[in-house]
């Protein structure tokens, strides 16, 4: 599962997830990409589920890049615990996604196969996505 090795602080504040992705919004490593069209939070487990779906569909061919990283800790208090007594412990890690962010990239496979693989990964994602190709200048 993806998570940071070390962080300066164990817990973070909530913060708002607004605006569009100005970085990481173009296909830069592979030929095809899966781009988010809505905003949300993707957990480390969802990222891994998407990666597995893609790699199992393309079998041995091609190369996959994961373009997002879960660097935000989400805390939870245990069940049936009264309010107060401080912030809960870190339960899982998420990546905050803005519209336009490229989530995965693939190279070395045909376009049809890439579309099918990304469709399987998109079914695991909590955000709407679209298929994009590398823009050649």
Curated annotation (Swiss-Prot):
The keyword rRNA-binding applies. GO terms for molecular function: rRNA binding; structural constituent of ribosome; tRNA binding. The keyword tRNA-binding applies. InterPro entries: Ribosomal_uL16 (IPR047873), Ribosomal_uL16_bact-type (IPR000114), Ribosomal_uL16_CS (IPR020798), Ribosomal_uL16_dom (IPR016180), Ribosomal_uL16_sf (IPR036920). Pfam families: Ribosomal_L16. One of its GO terms (biological process) is translation. GO terms for cellular component: cytosolic large ribosomal subunit. Keywords: Ribonucleoprotein, Ribosomal protein, RNA-binding, rRNA-binding, tRNA-binding. Belongs to the universal ribosomal protein uL16 family. HAMAP family: Ribosomal_uL16. Part of the 50S ribosomal subunit. Binds 23S rRNA and is also seen to make contacts with the A and possibly P site tRNAs. This is Large ribosomal subunit protein uL16. It comes from Francisella tularensis subsp. tularensis (strain SCHU S4 / Schu 4).
């Amino acid at each position: 599962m993806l998570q940071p090795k070390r962080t300066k602080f164990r817990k973070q504040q909530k913060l708002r997830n607004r605006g569009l992705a100005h970085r990481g919004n173009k296909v830069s490593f592979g030929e095809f990409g899966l781009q988010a069209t809505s905003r949300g939070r993707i957990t480390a487990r969802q990222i891994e589920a998407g990666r597995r779906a893609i790699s199992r569909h393309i079998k041995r061919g091609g190369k996959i890049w994961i373009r997002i990283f879960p660097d935000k800790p989400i805390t939870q208090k245990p069940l049936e615990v009264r309010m107060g007594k401080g912030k809960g412990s870190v339960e899982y890690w998420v990546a905050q996604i803005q519209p336009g962010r490229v989530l995965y990239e693939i190279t070395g496979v045909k376009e049809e196969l890439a579309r099918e693989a990304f469709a399987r990964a998109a079914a695991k994602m909590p955000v709407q996505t679209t298929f994009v190709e590398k823009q050649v200048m």
